[in-house]
Amino acid sequence: MCAPSLTNLGVCPCETINIRLIKKESMSYLFTSESVSEGHPDKVCDQIADAIVDSLIAADPQSKVACEVLATRGQVVLAGEVRSQGYVDIDATVRRVVEGIGYNQAAYGFDAHSCGILSAIHDQSPDINRGVDRSAPEEQGAGDQGLMFGYATRETPNYMPLAIDLAHSLLLELAHIRKHEPSLMPYLRPDAKSQITIEYSDDHHPLRIDTIVLSTQHDEFITPEKRQSQDDADSAMRQRIEDDVRSLLIPRLVARYDASIQALFQGDYKLFVNPTGKFVIGGPSGDTGVTGRKIIVDADLALELAGRKTGGRG
């Protein structure tokens, strides 16, 4: 009679067989998250729209505001619908936001003092307003819905997943240097993007930092000398920025965290700084920005890179 434990596997012990026990090998995996700076063209638009909404709600808490923004070389375009008893100076608000971000020089191709501002914001349709303006709070509607997903985690004190928290913090430190300690990296301009890749164990514990990618806009602070090509000058600029990132920026990033996270940086991680070689033309001058394309960066989540976004640099 066949043994039950083997017949359950579809194997008869009456036959000559070899059975190999297979042990599942542990397998680590890589997890990547991305952040963009306040000077990224899409985030410029988000911040302008935020400021318009905030100003109107401050003036009239019952305001209903839909505001979309497009920013490109030398130009900001606003469109949307508003129902409010408040007033906001669109022109002044836009220039204040752009100035605060750091676009304050004509050499950037987009600056607070000279950019054109076109506003096509108009009254909200009364037909739409009927659906979103109710006297009873429990009957209050919403014009649009957005769906995001994510999770809280104990990886960081603020419950953010570690990869996205590191990506955010790297750019916050970069912005602090640019605005408050410019002598350290005097060539910095506002636009930047970061990516952090972490190796995790198969039971989802961070093992080490695998890769740090930072693209940061900069002045053209090295020009070709005699018998030197433009490529040589570009290479020298990129190397200077990489050296500063390694010696100044990353130590500041690491210092923000406790010893357990600091230990993840002790391995031989890969560092890519301005991997295209040069990033002088940036911000809305180099890449048109639109509201709503960086919602994922604002959400409290980290997502594995599962596909590529078509068109532009994303």
Predicted ranges, named:
Residues 2, 12-14:
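Cysteine-centered motifs
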Residues 25-66:
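N-terminal, positively charged regions that mediate nucleic acid binding
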Residues 66-84:
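Short, charge-patterned binding micro-sites
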Residues 81-88, 276-295:
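Short glycine/threonine-rich loop-to-helix capping motif typified by GTGT followed
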Residues 250, 290-314:
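Conserved mixed alpha/beta catalytic, RNA-binding, or beta-rich assembly cores of soluble enzyme
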